[in-house]
């Protein structure tokens, strides 16, 4: 039976989240274009410095998404136990903020004390290292603003506040664009700072974003009701539950990030042609998963709130709807990729060999996206929202490290298969997880009790 209210609710949550992801992609593309105008050395320095910052970003996402499981569940409980649920909500946000600040401090100290050593992990080129160190000087402070705005945004989304963070992201995009243009190229009477200007522009944009998001959470939001005085509240009675539910998400996302870098290293050693072809397809991959990411987060929010209300049967039915939605979005994404692959590849001035490899990769991506959409909405959405975070942590990493990376190495370096099959092997964990999560879903063991 078609439940129009359910799909309207999912669309209400997923659309702003997807648009916010699209804006983030746009910001990254603009940064690349602007810094790219300075030269290859400058572009490489900023790109490699951001590789380290992206690790921090992924860890913050893990902190936020882990906390969101509890926040959504407690928000759903407010009808039955309003006082206890409201207190648990504030305690969860307090722990989330404290963990984020601690993590930001660790990364900031790393960039302050040994920026050169960090850059040398990625390159041996002295000019690139020197410029990367310059970029890190401004990014030390950026870490705190980036982390706080990110986790507070996820927290607000978990109680249905999805539009306000979207509008703030649009504002931050405009601020970032203007600040980068002014400081990179020395416009509007500002000094020409080049790489340092790119870092300063990002710092200003993150300061704006964090000020508005955190200001709203601390002074205006009435759903969570978190205020400045709550930053000092006692949370010891909820730390155990936070660790049990949230930390596996943080560990899972962190290890997956390392695994993703390992896959990138494998691709990097398959030759210039494969690397160039993969670069051509990267934007298409990002664009095709924007809506999927939105539905993933909507799945976690809806599932958590429904279980918080105590309606287990309804959550099971909604899980089935999310499964069908994942398959449908995957098929639509596959059609989109195949439709745009030709024009995108032809827009690049590359050799015939690179164009052929890119075409093979596009076909492989269009196949994998069906499985990726389905399992992502199930694992990062429904099952995570159900509190099944420990099992997800194990499944994510077993399928990646035991299946996809060994198969990718075998296909690329031993069997020397075509680009299509190498990519399919590197992403085979997506296929395996799809069947695993369907089995897990039917078993019903994914729904975990959460203590208030």
Map each language-model feature to its residues:
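Transmembrane helical elements of multi-pass membrane transporters/channels
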Residues: 12-31, 138, 149, 172, ...
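Small-residue-rich hydrophobic transmembrane alpha-helices
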Residues: 43-109, 146-165, 264, 275-341, ...
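Short runs within selected transmembrane alpha-helices of multi-pass transporters and secretion channels
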Residues: 64, 68, 139-158, 165-176, ...
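Interfacial/gating helices of multi-pass transporter permease domains
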Residues: 35-54, 127-131, 195-197, 237-245, ...
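Short alpha-helical transmembrane segments in multi-pass integral membrane proteins
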Residues: 1-17, 71-144, 190-247, 303-369, ...
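Alpha-helical transmembrane segments and their lipid-water interface positions
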Residues: 24, 28-31, 35, 57-64, ...
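Helix-terminus/linker motif at the lipid-water interface of multi-pass membrane proteins
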Residues: 22, 26-44, 119-126, 182-193, ...
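N-terminal transmembrane alpha-helices
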Residues: 2-33, 37-38, 54-66, 101-108, ...
């Amino acid at each position: 039976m078609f439940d129009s209210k359910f799909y309207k609710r999912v669309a209400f949550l997923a659309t702003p989240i997807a648009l916010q992801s699209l804006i983030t992609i746009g910001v990254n593309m603009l940064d690349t274009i602007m810094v790219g105008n300075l030269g290859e050395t400058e572009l490489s320095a900023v790109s490699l410095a951001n590789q380290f910052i992206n690790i921090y970003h992924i860890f913050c996402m893990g902190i936020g998404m882990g906390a969101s499981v509890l926040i959504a569940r407690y928000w759903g409980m407010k009808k039955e136990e309003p006082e206890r649920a409201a207190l648990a909500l504030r305690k969860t946000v307090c722990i989330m903020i404290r963990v984020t600040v601690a993590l930001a401090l660790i990364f900031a100290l790393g960039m302050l004390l040994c920026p050169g050593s960090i850059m040398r992990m990625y390159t041996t080129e002295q000019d690139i290292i020197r410029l990367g160190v310059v970029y890190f000087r401004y990014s030390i402070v950026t870490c705190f603003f980036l982390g706080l705005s990110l986790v507070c945004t996820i927290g607000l989304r978990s109680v249905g506040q999805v539009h306000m963070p979207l509008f703030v992201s649009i504002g931050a995009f405009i601020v970032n664009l203007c600040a980068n243009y002014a400081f990179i190229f020395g416009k509007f009477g500002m000094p020409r700072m080049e790489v340092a200007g790119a870092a300063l522009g990002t710092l200003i944009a993150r300061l704006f974003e964090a000020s508005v998001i955190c200001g709203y959470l601390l002074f205006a939001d009435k759903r969570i009701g978190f205020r400045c005085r709550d930053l000092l509240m006692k949370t010891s009675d909820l730390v155990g539950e936070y660790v049990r539910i949230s930390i596996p998400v943080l560990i899972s996302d962190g290890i997956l990030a390392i695994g993703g870098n390992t896959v990138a290293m494998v691709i990097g050693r398959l030759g210039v042609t494969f690397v160039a072809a993969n670069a051509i397809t990267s934007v298409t991959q990002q664009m095709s998963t924007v809506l999927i990411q939105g539905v993933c987060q909507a799945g976690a929010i809806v599932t958590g709130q429904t279980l918080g209300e105590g309606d287990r049967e309804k959550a099971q039915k909604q899980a089935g709807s999310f499964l069908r939605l994942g398959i449908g979005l995957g098929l639509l994404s596959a059609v989109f990729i195949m439709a745009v692959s030709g024009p995108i590849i032809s827009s690049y001035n590359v050799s015939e060999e690179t164009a052929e490899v890119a075409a093979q990769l596009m076909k492989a991506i269009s196949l994998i996206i069906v499985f990726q959409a389905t399992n992502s909405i199930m694992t990062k959405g429904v099952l995570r929202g159900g509190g099944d975070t420990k099992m997800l942590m194990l499944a994510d990493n077993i399928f990646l490290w035991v299946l996809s990376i060994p198969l990718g190495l075998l296909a690329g370096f031993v069997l020397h298969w075509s680009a299509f099959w190498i990519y399919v092997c590197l992403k085979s964990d997506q296929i395996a997880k799809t069947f695993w999560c369907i089995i897990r879903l039917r078993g019903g063991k994914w729904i975990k009790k959460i203590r208030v």
